Amino acid sequence: MNREQWLNECIQRLRPDFEQLARPLPEKIRASCSWPSKSGLAAKKRRIGEAWSSRNSADQSHEVFISPVLKEPIEVAATLVHELVHCAVGVEEGHKGKFPRLAKALGLVGKMTATTASAELKAHLQQVTDSIGPYPHAELTHSNATKKQGCRLLKVVCECGCVVRMTRKWLDEVGPPTCGCGSPMVEEEGDGDDE
């Protein structure tokens, strides 16, 4: 079983939950492990799931994408439930109107744009995922670390308060410059990052 088969099997096992609440899922839903269309790698407000309306699909299927940063079956299934709520009530509802009513009835809690599973929903999803088997996926990570500065600039100061920045190479080769006021400038001791 691959990731997509696992996700689509999970959908089939969750269908009765939606039917019990008189909000049956559309017949044609495809789920896959893929990056959302935007903010999939964002440092803040990262999207971990996305649902697309059947109107966007050539064969009128709803498309659900689960981010590859997720690896835990319960978290994956809870995200899938959130996206399935969009499919059941209509993607155009956003996170208002019918969406919060159905989401809460299914056991999703928290801010509606970033729901988590309640204890009851987690227990239910544990049974569902145990019956399917392990989620066949390894977490995909992306570093948002800033690139290391290629050229460190050192602070050179004058007693008049003038500050310039220079590379170590130029300080070693030609020395500190003379300030516009005529006074000599000196390299400031320390890391030079305080201004």
Label the predicted regions:
Residues 1-72, 91-195:
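Metalloprotease/metallohydrolase-associated module, dominated by Zn2+-dependent proteases
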Residues 78-91:
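Active-site recognition of the HExxH zinc-binding catalytic motif
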